[in-house]
Amino acid sequence: MPESLIAGIPVHFPFEPYPVQRAYMEKVIQCLKDGTNGVLESPTGTGKTLSLLCSSLAWIRTRQSEHQQQMIKLDKGADLLGGGAGGGPELSDLAKTMGKANNWGVPKVIYASRTHSQLTQAMRELKRTAYSNMRSVVLGSRDQLCIHPEVSREVGNSNKVNMCKLRVHSKTCTFQLRVESKKDHPDFRGPSIMDIEDLIKVGQKLKMCPYYASKELVPQADITFMPYNYLLDPKARKANKIELGNTIVILDEAHNIEKICEESASVQIKSSDVAIAIEDVTHIMKAFASDSPQDMAGDEPKDFTIDDLMLLKEMLLDLEKAIDAVAVDNPIDGATYPASMIYELLGKANFTYGNVATIVALLDKLVQYLMVASQQQMSLRKGGSFTLLSDLLTIVFANKESVMGKVHASFKVHVQVEESKQPQGKQAPAKQAGGWLSKASLTNGSTGKVAKIINFWCFNPGFGMEQLLNTQVRSVILTSGTLAPLKPLIAELAIPVAQHLENPHIVDQSQVYVKIIGTGPDRQPLISNYTNRDNPKYISSLGQTILNVSRLVPDGLLVFFPSYPMLNKCVDAWQASGLWADIASKKPIFLEPRGKDQFTSTMEEFYQAIRDSKGACFMAVCRGKVSEGLDFADRNGRAVIITGLPFPPLKDPKVILKRRYLESNRTRENQLLSGNEWYNLEATRAVNQAIGRVIRHRNDYGAILLCDSRFKDAAQVQQLSKWIRGHLGDRPQCSPFGPIVRELRQFFKNAETTMKQPDERESGAPLETVIKKEDEPLAPISQIKREPGSNATFKAANETAIKVEMANSIKSWSPDDYACAAGRKLGGSSAPNAMDFMSRLDSNVSSIDFNCMDSRNGSNSSGLVKIHKRERSSPPGSSQSSSQTAKKRYKLVENISTIKVEPPVEVKKEVPESRAAFLREIRSLVGQDQFRAFGQALLEYKDGSKDKFEALMKVVFEVLGGPRCRHLLVGMRKYIKADDKPEFDIRLAKLEKS
């Protein structure tokens, strides 16, 4: 493959990089060389994934070559540490740490994305590059990788995890036992790149557990692929033994990273969870007291005693009592308390920092015990309540006492009334009976206390990012097709960022038609605000608008509504008036199902209907699975209609508290959004995400129709994605409906004659699906093959609920694809950008239902901030693809855009306490030659005379004297000999004055 020198690093790229790709790779390499962080935006179709992989691995390969020489020099330097006088313990220890620098080795890459299908697609890209021989591994869940016939049949991810742990602990899993003997087998060690499917195939062939075997590859891997939650969730990071020191962390598809960080630190517990836990402890205690142990786990040895159970039950009863005592004056809105309340609540039940590790270990043992018992007694629960309690304790007490100030500022406790549930069978209330073998009532009816939900919510995404940075990572790179506005993103994440990039889109003006439609064909204003939602004239005019557009748009038409209630209201009205039948006569209509079971069949029917000359119309909801997780490239989505702004529920407690948090923490310096700005931006993020369904690669074309007059507001336009704003002009206006009809007809006429039409291979087929069980990590993807002339067939690995990803995914890059665009300024691969939701993190987190609408949830367009950004994840549905057709011709137009680089955000740094961290930070901030000179001068100074001090000062002030390293220069004083410190202070003072 051709080699390009980018930022001083030779990069093997499939072809001569285009300007957007070169600019992107330069920023990536600069981050890696300097050990700094970057926020890089490059729209879909610009070859982001390919550029990211090639640039990062090119730098790694260069460092590997340098490291061979570096290790030799460091080993020789270590020999100088054997003795000598002077320097004091600090200097001696620092020198010893310096001698161990070779242990840091070459940094490794961790590539994280939201879903396993996105990771699989990235690995497929990697297989086609010059770096396919570099060692890689993907970390998957037991749900995806387990091949044990009994464990894999368990329903629910937590059940599989606990059953697997039990079998491994008892040494009854033959697949896991074979890992040690088979881990060096050529079939396993041979391939450099193995994705989920490859691991399963090799595991089945060798009868070896793919889950545990994959972990054997991590220490030697140059790049490790994993989903976000493995990286950002402290529980998952600990469980998977992920070491982050001196690693390069790449967070792809990072436009929803703030929400993920917040949810990974949040947790919920219900009164009913505590009551069930009490009941489960009681069952186990009865088994201990019984003369017939076969009723539970038989004669298996127990890892706990009856005293452990008695103590735990007493603590749970106290916790139940403490929750009952929490005041909720307003049952509808709930009550909000400071973060300290959760620690006080748990403290009343004697859950403390001192004993939490012991309690969590006991809960895990009880879960495994019940897993065994449930195999013999099917009526028993499997310890789900213990898992929820363990999650609560793990997340709450993960925040060390030393950071309680930040916890109080970043978290809130919100208490809601839990809907009462009557337990099965007769049960005496625990507090009434009081005995050790009593059972807890789920409703606590005898006490008159209502059941409650305790939410421990994090509103500061920077809290999770700070924990990540504290692991001594070398660099963090956040990238996505839409990250802007960058400054508020960086401010919320609170990380130092040295490199910024906003790449332009690769499509030109002739490929996209964007208009704001302010009135319908009957001149009725189109505005989907709170006061207009029940207006029959507005609903009718909106339907007539969709009807007229459906006559003009070929193939697929997507219509997005602000919420499910609004969608249902329009459907009912149109069916009653006959508009529904009129639209359906032009294009068959498909509605986004809220249930998962119906989704696959609905999407399959839609893609089949696209092949008909009429095409099809799909009506969905912003933040639904169609808007967030699917790719409607080419014929599957030639136009998208946005019917309104999807504001979050105004009265949702989490929305209210998030706005309060921003208002109370916003300063001129930190550049946080105001509460109103965040609220309005949430709506536009969802719009940007929905718009992104149709323009998916550089040869795609389509129309974007914004059917709400509020989109003409200048502040609102500024929130739209950068490439959309370019089509609306400096002063966007609502266009009359008549001219729009003429322009839209002409746009598609021109596009169909000038643009190359995709063939079946490129566009709608085959489908790639992912079948998963509800609320579990995604299962491995398998490509669905379609014989010529036949419909796509769908393979399902499981039967329960279905999640479809990468539908209609863009074909992988080919040098020929780029060669045909020789006349263009910009180019790029059709980088796969399959969008789907990240499986819920292990913690039980309450999410906002952004599609909830009632009389209390109003919205308006005031206070809009002039920024734009793409949204994260949300509600039901997801999809699949089908086929595509016809022939196109290219009309290539040069598209020259300017790359916008924002100034760095200054973040004050502190001097690392430990010697290792001190040296590691120096190494991450300076070049190799400078670090080597610093180390040599330090070693000579340890045992040298006064002239060695002069030599050290010359090097230290040269290497650390710049603004980026000034804090390290100040920290260097600790390692200077006592006699030399006055002179060091004088020189430092002179530097500060200069």
Curated annotation (Swiss-Prot):
Primary enzyme class: isomerase
Chain location of the short sequence motif DEAH box per the record: 252-255
Ligand binding ([4Fe-4S] cluster): 146, 164, 173, 209
Signal peptide: none
UniProt-listed Enzyme Commission number(s): 5.6.2.-
GO biological process: DNA recombination; DNA repair; DNA replication; male germ-line stem cell population maintenance; negative regulation of DNA recombination; negative regulation of t-circle formation; regulation of double-strand break repair via homologous recombination; telomeric loop disassembly
Entry annotated with the keyword Cell inner membrane: no
Subcellular location: Nucleus
SUPFAM superfamilies per record: P-loop containing nucleoside triphosphate hydrolases
Positions annotated to bind ATP: 42-49
GO cellular component: nucleus
CDD domains, alphabetized: DEAHc_FancJ, HN_RTEL1, SF2_C_XPD
Domain Helicase ATP-binding: residue ranges: 7-316
Catalytic activity: ATP + H2O = ADP + phosphate + H(+)
Amino acid composition bias (Low complexity), ranges on this chain: 874-884
Region (Disordered): 861-887
Gene3D superfamilies to which the protein is assigned, alphabetical: 1.20.1160.20, P-loop containing nucleotide triphosphate hydrolases (3.40.50.300)
Keywords: 4Fe-4S, ATP-binding, DNA damage, DNA repair, DNA-binding, Helicase, Hydrolase, Iron, Iron-sulfur, Isomerase, Metal-binding, Nucleotide-binding, Nucleus
Chief site of localization: nucleus
Function recorded in the entry: A probable ATP-dependent DNA helicase implicated in DNA repair and the maintenance of genomic stability. Acts as an anti-recombinase to counteract toxic recombination and limit crossover during meiosis. Regulates meiotic recombination and crossover homeostasis by physically dissociating strand invasion events and thereby promotes noncrossover repair by meiotic synthesis dependent strand annealing (SDSA) as well as disassembly of D loop recombination intermediates.
NCBIfam families xrefs: rad3
Listed HAMAP family: RTEL1
Family: Belongs to the helicase family. RAD3/XPD subfamily.
Protein name: Regulator of telomere elongation helicase 1 homolog
Taxonomy of the source species: Eukaryota, Metazoa, Ecdysozoa, Arthropoda, Hexapoda
